[in-house]
Amino acid sequence: MKLDVPSDLGMVGDAVELVASHLPPGTLSPRRISFNLRTALAEALGNAIRYGNGEDPERVVQVRVELGRDFVRIHVMDDGLGFDTGRLPDPTHPDNLEREYGRGLFVIRHLVDDVAFNEKGNGICLTLRAG
């Protein structure tokens, strides 16, 4: 499945539901779909729209879904310049606990089984395994 999502934060929910509704039964448990997948994908899309594409309506976020026998892999790529994930501040550090932002990737990493980034830093790959 491939999907181009307009850079409009109002479209995130519809895009997440479209992806979740197209997963074959039994690919992931209902709980993993209803919470882990939906939450992680919504966060990744929101970051791509807000930070990658700067909410520019002329840009889109590309979503590609790969289905395996026991996994779902979701690629999310924006049109932005990318960023170095190693330079993100640790959201659990005492100096960062009261920040209003900066927890998105931390949350994603705890919801999915594997997270990978493309070399440019404008694409994220989320892998959820059955079980």
Q: For each predicted feature, which ranges?
A:
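Conserved beta-strand-loop-beta-strand hairpin that lines the nucleotide-binding pocket
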Residues: 1-2, 49-131
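Helix-loop-beta hinge of the Bergerat
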Residues: 1-31
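Conserved short strand/loop->alpha-helix "switch" segment adjacent to the catalytic nucleotide/phosphoryl-transfer site
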Residues: 20-42, 97-99
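Conserved polar catalytic motif of the HATPase_c/GHKL fold
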Residues: 43, 47
